[in-house]
């Protein structure tokens, strides 16, 4: 009997302990999304592969969205892990899956059809949806002009939502949604006449138009809209709150503005004829000198594509050019600079590239240590054009105006003042054509962007072999070579 009683007591204690353990376990709170990210030490992000969002070049990962989300990961003190989606449905569906991405950073616009799936962040970039057509074809000016046209947009996109709304007032409007294309593909299809029209956001057109010289804006559709990040609707708000705090801070401290300037502050400088001409020269002239750019870039430890962009801005890759001021050769060196860099024949493209590379890096190394990348590169380019003395004058003016003398975004505002008497009389080195280095830097940045995009690893070697298809450059000339209005 005593044995049975003892057994019952032990069982009761065991059941009590087990129940207490389960009860306590149930009371332990599940870690929040933000806590899980910090515990894992990794921020898993899904995005799209395009010039306006994210792509990989020979130096690694880059893109507006990539850099912005990298700043966020650094704020959290975690590593960034990127994956790309083939289409928007795949991107949205990936959020919330176990061990999947917790954040979508892909230039998304809030969509009613997605609100059951995701929660959107505060805005960080304002864009305008635009109807795109091919130059030389009839230009639609309103929604009625879309009827009877072959239109394609990204499947599940906010542009598809816009067309659905327009169709209510224009029943004859038909369009195709595709999950097999990206924005670059849609613009190429318009450029080559495969489709009549597409819809894209203004920032993506700005980044891509230079590759497709025939595309034009027909008209803007509706009001401007905001791009946002997204998290899964089923997640708690801890990560979303942190994202919103970060984006608000980035807006106030200038991080967003610097990124906008870096990626969008120079995209409209080429114009139609310039874009078409550059694309032709990319195929016809660059292959002759590419090995020299690569060789001396390696010696000087600089990106060869940046050197090539400087060379194109200076001479359009023509080795025998001479200006009215006496600068000569592919890199347009002065006699004094050529002598200092050990160049005996400025018209020899190999020597010119060697001298230009050496001179550019000399300028860059002599800049004030307080100037950090990427601004350091833009400053060096400006000094390559106008001289370090005038650049320092512009930095001094920036200080007087309570601007940041170490940021290109601020200093480029001061450079044009060097041609105005009321300003240059206050400087050490006096008058300069200060607007020139601003355009010089903007052009080189744009050429560099294009070279970076077309020399991605999967396209390696095709430029040199003459096999690279540069969008907008076919055997036939474009329909109209007049600049866009």
From Swiss-Prot:
GO molecular function: peptidoglycan lytic transglycosylase activity
EC number: 4.2.2.n1
Region (Non-LT domain), start-end ranges: 30-267
One GO-annotated biological process of the protein: cell wall macromolecule catabolic process
Signal peptide (from-to): 1-29
Catalyzed chemical reaction(s): Exolytic cleavage of the (1->4)-beta-glycosidic linkage between N-acetylmuramic acid (MurNAc) and N-acetylglucosamine (GlcNAc) residues in peptidoglycan, from either the reducing or the non-reducing ends of the peptidoglycan chains, with concomitant formation of a 1,6-anhydrobond in the MurNAc residue
Membrane protein topology class: Peripheral membrane protein
Known role: Murein-degrading enzyme that degrades murein glycan strands and insoluble, high-molecular weight murein sacculi, with the concomitant formation of a 1,6-anhydromuramoyl product. Lytic transglycosylases (LTs) play an integral role in the metabolism of the peptidoglycan (PG) sacculus. Their lytic action creates space within the PG sacculus to allow for its expansion as well as for the insertion of various structures such as secretion systems and flagella.
NCBIfam families to which the protein is assigned, alphabetical: PRK10859.1
Protein's name in the database: Membrane-bound lytic murein transglycosylase F
Species in which this protein is naturally found: Pseudomonas putida (strain GB-1)
